[in-house]
Amino acid sequence: MASSLLLALLFLTLATVVNLKTDGPCPACWGATFDLESHRELLLDLAKKSILDKLHLSQRPILSRPVSREALKTALRRLRGTRAETLLEHDQRQEYEIISFADTGLSNINQTRLEFHFSDRTTGGVEVLQTRFMFFMQLPPNTTQTMNIRVLVLRPYDTNLTLTSQYMLQVDASGWYQLLLGPEAQAACSQGHLTLELVPESQLAHSSLILDGVSHRPFVAAQVRVEGKHRVRRRGINCQGLSRMCCRQEFFVDFREIGWHDWIIQPEGYAMNFCTGQCPLHVAGMPGISASFHTAVLNLLKANTDAGTARRGSCCVPTSRRPLSLLYYDRDSNIVKTDIPDMVVEACGCS
């Protein structure tokens, strides 16, 4: 309900701004007279609404289980060292990497049970591609240990966990270890919960076999993919001076300014940008506008233009966008890395 009211208020305010200036044929053609600073709050609200919509969130996450900065830095450093490849801009599918830190479950001297919680991301064609378990072990010098790692799942209509697969890992030194988990673990992650049980083959006289301290907290990294659309990058013309021609107006959204720096880890902000300016008839008809919240606003403004205007001119609209790479906490305090499509306006043209 609050989201709908915000959207309605935003549309109404933008429409009011444009209707005060009806000297142009297109409501998007604000030209050089558009006062950026006076509408700053309005644009920031638009940016927040767009990000939440693309992340399928009704409101910003409230962190229930904060993760220490030391654990966060360690996890990101380990992942960057083991996964060098990056998402390509021409990849047609949106990818996420979700990092879930372990909560200690039912454990004793013979075993350690770790619980990992994932938000429900299985809707909308999301596929879990890979699941990796990363943990730190500390052993006395000149010691070898064999660790049995079990994947436990809760079957439908069952109250007990079921063993679905297990892995044997030999450890001969203290340090970080990673294990690539199979389809059973991937299925568990897609259902929102994964349980791992670590059982040493022999008992060692050591108080901290598996460290779950501040900087050695075990975690699972799940790589998932969702189908998307192919985008082609084009260069745009930035607005300069007093030019009234169609151009790209740069606008930076600072996440600290809007109070989102506590749940968005990286980046510190992004260049939202928008299109403004006039479109002469001889440059009209450029294709390439893609459906987005930005486009919906412009379409509504166009519909609210003075009904008495007989001639509808060409509009200055986005013709190319690129994704926003975002690293953030979800509502379960998991770390999510994703590229949100169509967030940064790269080029503008005349519709």
From Swiss-Prot:
Q: What does this protein do?
A: Inhibins and activins inhibit and activate, respectively, the secretion of follitropin by the pituitary gland. Inhibins/activins are involved in regulating a number of diverse functions such as hypothalamic and pituitary hormone secretion, gonadal hormone secretion, germ cell development and maturation, erythroid differentiation, insulin secretion, nerve cell survival, embryonic axial development or bone growth, depending on their subunit composition. Inhibins appear to oppose the functions of activins.
The keyword Secreted belongs to this UniProt entry's keyword annotation? yes
Q: What is its main location?
A: secreted
- Which residues does the record annotate as propeptide? 19-236
Q: Which region is the signal sequence? A: 1-18
Task: Write out the similarity annotation.
Answer: Belongs to the TGF-beta family.
Q: List the disulfide bonds.
A: C239-C247, C246-C316, C275-C348, C279-C350
InterPro entries attached to this UniProt entry: Cystine-knot_cytokine (IPR029034), Inhibin_betaC (IPR001318), TGF-b_C (IPR001839), TGF-beta-rel (IPR015615), TGFb_CS (IPR017948)
Protein name (Swiss-Prot/TrEMBL): Inhibin beta C chain
User: What keywords does the record list, in alphabetical order?
Assistant: Disulfide bond, Glycoprotein, Growth factor, Hormone, Secreted, Signal
Q: Which gene encodes it?
A: Inhbc
- Residues annotated as glycosylated are N110, N142, N160
Q: Name one GO cellular component term.
A: extracellular space
